[in-house]
Amino acid sequence: MTKLELLAPAKNLECGIAAIDHGADAVYIGAAKFGARVAAGNSIDDIRQLCVYAHQFDAKVYVTVNTIIYDDELEATNRLILELQEAGVDAILIQDMGLLQFSILNSQFSISLHASTQTDNRTPEKVRWLRSLGFRRVVLARELSVEEIAAIHQQVPDVELEVFVHGALCVSYSGLCYASQHCFGRSANRGACAQVCRMKFDLLDADGRELEHQRHLLSLKDLNQSAHLEELIQAGAVSFKIEGRLKDVTYVKNVVAAYSQRLDSIIAKHPQEYCRASKGHCSYTFTPNLKKTFNRGFTTYFLHGRQPDIFSPDTPKAMGEYVGTVKELRRDSFNVAGTAAFANGDGLCFINKEHELEGFRVNRAEGNRLFPQQMPRNLRPGMALYRNNDMEFERLLARQSSVRKIPVTFKLSETTDGFSLSALGTTVSIVCEHQQAEKPQQENIIRQLSKLGGTPYECSGVEMPDGFNYFIPSSMLADLRRQWVEGKNQGDRFLIESNQTTCPHDSRPSDPPHYDHPYLYNIANRQAQQFYGVQEPTAYELRGGNGPLMQCRHCLQYAMGYCVKHGGQKPTYKYPLFLRLGDGRRFRLEFDCKHCQMNVYAE
């Protein structure tokens, strides 16, 4: 039976616990340093607490150490990995092959390694190479189609494939974006991306003719594969990853619950083929709705091939759900044509005639007549209106919004000198006199054993042998119940620790895939140099480079309708095309039609 894992982001301990409570089978979280989100660091103690909580449900905790490392950071990074291993972490996500070199040479190292999407995993050859190095799981590039995912699974079936299913998209293949480093000295491969792709650009042809003026031409919509999970499962993916280690707890609650319910519905259709990777069922106080939390509009990206509507040129900000159109304007209010219900405090927005996003807060809602705190000057009848902050929904999620419990059927049995209690592979016993009861005891036994508050368990039944009618004092039943909970938790911790093993690497790994430019290997330290067998570091952050700053499957030529390969009209502009930032800096575009890829170069 195939275990399916819903993998959720955790900015901090609070978000990690919320993710588990709302149905995640695993969470990924950053340590204090060396994660791909500088602003999402956590202490070893918080990570240890998260491991203890998650492991109650057989859920996993993965820690991101997925930046490139400099020589003066190697000792601290190596020490961090061993500390995370001791804290009970289930796997480490890495980008820097210097850390793999450390794992091979250090006998203390026993934790599983996952190849981060930052290692640019888009071909069967790359995944096969990673498998030969000992990676048991590979996080695939977001750009892959379902057919490409299936091909990787068919050719490298013993590697677990992790795919992104929801959240923000990088316009460049992950790990190969150097635009932030080039423009601002902030390395995306060091967790400090300045999000150049979310900025405004002019698009110019070779004669300087302006084809687009100050649009967000590289800003992609957010990924949403919630309707396509079954396709991804059939293609061979086993872990379904939600992006968002900078997102708040309400985002985590809503998105995790939505995807957990969808996975459960798929499993209900195929109970003999699939099951969840962790234990427990969730009871929600709200109905999950992906449109109600942060999103830039949704796309399935390249899941079914190239699509025209994958980017959001008007704004890189969250627009939220469509709620209607502006109908009638008055001095201090307006009407909305639509069926949505509004609440005081809702955040609404619209795209004005200059293609810019404007937002405002609703001070008072009287049905479909809304009174903003201040009337937007550029609001016009007929404009589409979006809600990017739903106050009623936020209030629901601000409270406890889910309870996760593991159903337990106890088996109570007689022993030679007392009684034993068994469930879920754990058995405990007490010494107690076998005293026949004067009246039936089943009701009291069930009541006492069901008092599992403050634990992840709920009693779904108690099995007793036929004719079992002993009097067992309530205090002893309570002691038996407490012993079982303690024994179960200790057994789970031992099981998790015993499962911390690396995937053996081949004695003769295959050769690494070839890159045309040395900096694309991201070699930034002596351990990585030793791994690749080179004498000098080649990382762009240290040496620069003349190759592409970005390699994108998103193509502006296709988006404008000028891709002849896909049935577009013949271009009327003169090559090459350039992107220009507001400060005048230009970037040359190269359209690699053979590989269906747009490359961005510094001019």
PLM ranges: what are they?
Residues M1-H22, A26-A36, D46, L50-C51, ...:
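Surface-exposed amphipathic alpha-helical tracts and adjacent flexible/coil segments at the periphery
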Residues A39-S43:
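An active-site metal/cofactor-coordinating segment within enzyme catalytic domains
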Residues G98-L99:
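Alpha-helix capping/helix-boundary segments
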Residues I104-S110:
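Arg/Gly-rich low-complexity intrinsically disordered repeat tracts
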Residues S116-P124, V139-A141:
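Aromatic/His-enriched, Gly/Pro-containing loop or helix-boundary segments
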